[in-house]
Amino acid sequence: MSKNITIILSTHNEELSIDHTISELIKHIKDVEKVVVDDNSPDGTLETVKKINYPKLKIFNREKNKGLASAFLLGLINSSGDIIGWLDSNMGSLAIKFPEMISKLDNADIVLLSRYVSGGRDDRNIIRVVASRLINNLAKFILRSKIQDLSSGIFLMKRKVLLDVVPVASGHGEFMVEFLYKAEKKGNNIIEIPYVHPVDIEENSKSFPNLGRFLLLGFFYILRLFQAIFRR
C-alpha cells in the first residue's frame, strides 16, 4: 500500500513543545506531510512553526480558538495523504509509535494507540487515571463499543474511511469518540496497540487544568455519546 502520510496537529499555546513534536515526526516517519492548525496562540507558537524549515509543512492560523474538532476537519480538507493521522501537539515523544502503526495498517482501516489493551498504561496522577477510565468505560457501555480506548485520540487511518464517516466539526476531544464509534459501526477494522501515556505532558494538558474543568468536559463527553447514537 502507499505510504503517503499526513499528520494533523492542532495547536494553542504550544510554543515549548511544537518544535520537538514536529522534529520527532520527521525523525520517525519518512517524507511525512504535516498540517498545523493554530488557534491564534498568543505565546509565539505560530512564529515557532514558521521558523521550521521543512518543505511538506502546511500552516493555518485561525483568529479564534474554535476547538479540536473543527481544527481536525480543516486539517483533513487540506491534507494530501492517503493515510491520515492525529497527534496531540505536546505528545512528540509518542511519534516513535508511528512506524508500528503504519505497518499495522496493512491489515486495518484505523490503528489506534490504546492505554487499555495489554501493555498499555496511564502514568498520570491517580485522579486523572480514574476519571479517564470512568468516562471511557461509560462511553463503551453507552455506545456498546468493542474499542478499548475511545478517548485516546492518537491514531492513523486510511483516507477511504472518510467515504463512510465524516467528523462532526464541533466540540473538543469528544468529537473523536463519536468518530471512532461511527467508524466501528460502519464496519471498519480498528486495531489498537498499547502505549504508555506519559507523565511529563500533564501540566500542559488542555483537558485537565483542574478537576472541575475535567468533570465539566466529562459531562460534554457523555452528552456527545447520546448525540452520536441518534445522529445520522
Question: What does each of the following model-derived ranges do?
Answer:
Residues S23-D31:
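Short, acidic, metal-binding catalytic loop of nucleotide-sugar glycosyltransferases
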Residues M1-I5, S10, L16, H20, ...:
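Hydrophobic helical membrane-anchoring modules
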Residues V32-V35, L46-N78:
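Conserved donor nucleotide-binding strand/loop of the catalytic core
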Residues D38-E47, M91:
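A conserved acidic beta->alpha catalytic loop
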Residues R62-N78, I83, I96-G173, V199-F219:
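Acceptor/aglycone-binding surface of glycosyltransferases and processive sugar-polymer synthases
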